[in-house]
Regions:
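Active-site-adjacent C-terminal substructures of enzyme catalytic domains
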Residues: 1-70
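Mid-to-C-terminal alpha-helical segments outside catalytic/metal-binding sites
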Residues: 59-127
Length: 127
């Protein structure tokens, strides 16, 4: 068990994971993003603290997941929730660019999700 990738509820089987990924990629209007980034200091992770610190890498990871289907990514991340819950459209934008980078191994005292992994997309800063 990789304590840095442990969260609840767990996806028990590869078929469960595949079904969730298929649902997300389906573009269904009732399927939308929800983040529960849970940073726990390294010392607590080895005591069974569930939760993954995904904030630094979740958007680049989703860009790789949706590569070639950016419209479905936009719907999953934003449009579906706006439409389903009658939310106002934010006047801020996030730009994701194709640029290789390596996820940090540590952020303060926390190991982020996929620490040390190379990604092909990153969030453009300074907008």
């Amino acid at each position: 068990l990789n304590v840095h990738m442990f969260c609840k509820p767990t996806v028990k089987l590869a078929t469960d994971r595949d079904a969730l990924q298929e649902l997300v990629k389906s573009g269904h209007k009732n399927v939308m993003f929800g983040s529960d980034s849970a940073p726990h200091p390294l010392k607590n992770k080895f005591k069974g603290a569930a939760g993954i610190f995904s904030a630094p890498i979740i958007l680049p990871a989703l860009a790789e997941f949706f590569v070639g289907d950016e419209l479905k990514m936009q719907k999953f991340l934003s449009d579906n929730a706006i439409n389903n819950f009658g939310l106002e459209v934010a006047d801020r934008k996030i730009e994701i660019v194709e640029e290789e980078w390596i996820a940090p191994r540590m952020v303060g005292e926390v190991v982020p999700m996929w620490a040390g992994k190379t990604f092909n997309y990153k969030v453009k800063t300074g907008l």
